[in-house]
Amino acid sequence: MSELVNKMENLSVGDSAQKKSAYVPPHVKRRMKEGGSEPSSRNTENFGNGGRFGGSEHNGFGGGRGSWFGGNARGGGPRSSDRGGSSRFGKWVDGKHVPMKRNEKLEVQLFGTPEDPNFQSSGINFDNYDDIPVDASGEDVPDPITEFTSPPLDELLLENIKLARFTKPTPVQKYSVPIVAKGRDLMACAQTGSGKTGGFLFPVLSQSFSNGPASTPDESGYYMRKAYPTAVVLAPTRELATQIFDEAKKFTYRSWVKPCVVYGGADIRQQIRELERGCDLIVATPGRLNDLLERGKISLCSVKYLVLDEADRMLDMGFEPQIRHIVEGCDMPTVENRQTLMFSATFPTDIQHLAADFLKDYIFLSVGRVGSTSENITQKVLHVEDIDKRSVLLDLLAASDGGLTLVFVETKRMADALTDFLIMQNLSATAIHGDRTQAERERALAFFRTGRANVLVATAVAARGLDIPNVTHVINYDLPSDIDDYVHRIGRTGRAGNTGLATAFFNRGNKNVVKELVDILEEANQEVPSFLSQIAKEMSYGGGGGKSSRGGRGGYSRGNSTRDFRRHGGGGGSEWSSANRASSGWGNANRTGSGWGGSSGFGGSTESWSNASKTVGSNNSWW
């Protein structure tokens, strides 16, 4: 990583942002010196058309993503009362958990091998996290754990954690495990790459393994007519949902708990077939879950745990009416009769007010410095005019040390155009954005994860939550207008205690985020370029904002994104929630006359809303 940083510093970009009259990429220069020919217009890996991967190959992904157990998941018949009947699952017999026998072939499939780079251990460089400050607020906060032990964790879960090569809990896991074990609700704010997924899976699965399944109605026939999950995990994007599902498969190994995943863009009939075979933990996007609830394929009456991952994004992107319908408009137990856990890297004050409606007597957990960036990530800001961005990008890629590079752009059109340009330069690149089909998006991610494409050009659809091992460099080709999106983007590298590099292309078109960008760099002990300081001063003297806007919800101060509003001001939660939602169209008032009720609230397998409610959650790429 230090070699890559040194190579970057030798590039002719920076404060002066000098333009090049006739740019020749470094790899072309090398070929010309060696007497090589000019690069061909296309490589042979078929990454063309913005990385659409021609042909019909699905590479094991697509509509049947949740079908990892095969066509006969529960032994070919209805689910028995002991929750067993298959060699792939444990059983719950006479109030006891009976794990299945170990399966070495399945273990390699789930956990990989130590030398496999695609299965990254969270133990690497993990001691870097030991000094991270943790602030827990609320009444009677339990003491944190320091190691993975039983108690409080179930013995089978500990074995699976060991198979995953997790050696010690992350800061968020140290607190979330005892908090959930005590039956408390939780709002957890932790820096990206800090183990938030394990932060909710570990305690929820441990309690499930120990307490067993909830009782469900007896149903006869080959399949159950409904699934009765005991845990529901909501995620804003399809990619994040499948990633959580992949982790759930690891940690439910040999147990009675069967995980499933449902999301839009995939074959709903296949997802229904999986649900009919039984589902104990469901990972879902809000739109598809509402669709399945309307179809009567899922009952939430047995839910003990509700988890919202990237909760701030879901509540801020127009998902609140859908989530409120799931939580309050169906048969889910009330807030007093379930545990609710919310996780994200940022929780702005206005989102905390909304989130508080779904929680009871909760503990607020803030892990890491305010600003939520990791010092494991080296941040570089280069002054690059729009006309020079492609040239500078090629320089950075030529200086790469061979790791994976994630390039963020603002528009879908730019993602395709930039990917095609990189392919023309004989670089293995692919793209992911909301206009891709689900099969195309999953295949692009598969190519990137395995290194067949070492450059992924992405819009915001991939910015949140995705954990791709070996991403050594994140490049913000287009800086976002929201500084929190910048935090989440650069968090795709430097994960799990590892080091990473994040480079941002900045020019005066990005001056709306300059003040907060300087704050982020200073808080993470990063170098602030002189041109950035100068523009920040100009903005300050000229009365410029420097505040980022928040899609239709107004600006907010980033200073409270990781602080409990109950301790740091902002008024009473219930008073704010009721008064402001009534005036701003949020919450129950927004549902009235918005297409709720009956069968018209959701549009079948495509998850489109009725015409009256398309203004809510209209960005379908998040479904």
Swiss-Prot record:
Cellular component GO terms, alphabetical: cytoplasmic stress granule; nucleus; spliceosomal complex
Biased composition (Polar residues): 575-591, 611-623
InterPro entries named in the record: DEAD/DEAH_box_helicase_dom (IPR011545), Ded1/Dbp1_DEADc (IPR044763), Helicase_ATP-bd (IPR014001), Helicase_C-like (IPR001650), P-loop_NTPase (IPR027417), RNA-helicase_DEAD-box_CS (IPR000629), RNA_helicase_DEAD_Q_motif (IPR014014)
Catalytic activity, reaction form: ATP + H2O = ADP + phosphate + H(+)
Major site of localization recorded for this protein: cytoplasm
Keywords: ATP-binding, Cytoplasm, Helicase, Hydrolase, Initiation factor, Nucleotide-binding, Protein biosynthesis, RNA-binding
GO BP annotation list: cytoplasmic translational initiation; negative regulation of cytoplasmic translational initiation in response to stress; positive regulation of formation of translation preinitiation complex; regulatory ncRNA-mediated gene silencing; spliceosomal complex disassembly
Domain (Helicase ATP-binding) ranges: 177-365
Enzyme Commission numbers on file: 3.6.4.13
Segments of this protein annotated with the region Disordered: 1-93, 541-623
Subcellular location: Cytoplasm
Span(s) of short sequence motif Q motif: 146-174
Positions of ATP binding: 190-197
Pfam families: DEAD, Helicase_C
Any GO molecular function: ATP binding
Domain Helicase C-terminal residues, every copy: 392-536
Domain of life (superkingdom): Eukaryota
Bias (Gly residues) ranges: 60-78, 541-557, 594-604
Motif position, DEAD box: 309-312
Sequence similarity: Belongs to the DEAD box helicase family. DDX3/DED1 subfamily.
Domain remarks in the Swiss-Prot or TrEMBL record: The Q motif is unique to and characteristic of the DEAD box family of RNA helicases and controls ATP binding and hydrolysis.
Protein task: ATP-binding RNA helicase involved in translation initiation. Remodels RNA in response to ADP and ATP concentrations by facilitating disruption, but also formation of RNA duplexes.
Protein name per Swiss-Prot or TrEMBL: ATP-dependent RNA helicase DED1
Organism field: Eremothecium gossypii (strain ATCC 10895 / CBS 109.51 / FGSC 9923 / NRRL Y-1056) (Yeast)
